[in-house]
A protein has these predicted regions:
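Short acidic-glycine-tyrosine-enriched beta hairpin
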Residues: 85-101
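Short beta-strand His + acidic residue motifs that chelate non-heme Fe in jelly-roll/DSBH
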Residues: 63-64, 81-82, 98, 104-109, ...
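Short, conserved beta-strand element in jelly-roll/cupin
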Residues: 56-57, 65-82
Length: 135
């Protein structure tokens, strides 16, 4: 099985790396209240750098298992995160990380907008166990 890869480093070698703005999109048509945009790369295959993204959730929840760390910084609203029986509630300015190899559950009873950083995934292991639900 071939594994899709991205460059080992997402940097361009230039003095400044610039990623132009793009709008957030619904992840899938059947998940209308979950929107995102990946800023510097798509989380496909392996990567040795970080991946930056922005997410919005409107009265919905999401869970997935990821092989890399996932750090969320809440910009607006209120976000609940649960992993391994521990739950935290983020308010604007708060951040939390689900560490590699964990199932993370994220939900916004009303609305949440967050900036997310995926840590390195040098083996290219895939995220899985996706579940979307509306509140």
């Amino acid at each position: 099985m071939a594994i899709a890869t991205q460059p080992a480093s997402l940097t361009t070698g230039e003095t400044i790396d610039l990623w132009s703005a793009k709008s957030m999109k619904v992840m899938k048509d059947e998940w209308p209240r979950l929107r995102c945009r990946f800023v510097n790369a798509d989380p496909v295959g392996r990567w040795d750098d970080f991946i930056l993204s922005e997410w919005e959730m409107e009265a919905c929840g999401w869970e997935d298992f990821h092989p890399h760390s996932e750090t969320n910084f809440l910009v607006e609203g209120e976000l609940y995160i649960e992993s391994e029986g521990k739950t935290v509630i983020l308010r604007p300015g708060d951040s939390a990380r689900v560490n590699p190899g964990q199932l993370g559950r994220y939900w916004a009873p009303v609305y949440a907008r967050m900036v997310t950083v995926y840590g390195p995934n040098p083996q290219g292991a895939e995220s899985h166990s996706f579940r979307y639900y509306e509140i």
